[in-house]
């Protein structure tokens, strides 16, 4: 069973490139401090790596 990750948007996407905004939206994050729980897959880890300066990640 894959581990679960709790991903929280902690910095705003205002002024960020469109690809970073799209990645945040694809993770399911909308507003600041919104949190989603996702399974740890290579795709999700790649998305987190791309916007690591905007999000915080914890094990759920």
Curated annotation (Swiss-Prot):
Molecular function, one GO term: structural constituent of ribosome
A Pfam family that the UniProt record links to this protein: Ribosomal_L30
Any one of the GO BP annotations: translation
Keywords: Ribonucleoprotein, Ribosomal protein
Any one of the GO CC terms: cytosolic large ribosomal subunit
PROSITE patterns: RIBOSOMAL_L30 (PS00634)
Oligomeric form and interacting partners: Part of the 50S ribosomal subunit.
HAMAP family attached to this UniProt entry: Ribosomal_uL30_B (MF_01371_B)
Name of the protein in question: Large ribosomal subunit protein uL30
Organism: Bacillus cereus (strain ATCC 14579 / DSM 31 / CCUG 7414 / JCM 2152 / NBRC 15305 / NCIMB 9373 / NCTC 2599 / NRRL B-3711)
């Amino acid at each position: 069973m894959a581990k679960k990750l709790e991903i929280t948007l902690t910095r705003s996407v205002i002024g960020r490139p469109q690809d970073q905004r799209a990645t945040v939206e694809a993770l399911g994050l909308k507003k600041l401090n919104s949190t989603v729980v996702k399974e740890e897959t290579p795709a999700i880890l790649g998305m987190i790596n791309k916007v690591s300066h905007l999000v915080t990640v914890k094990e759920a």
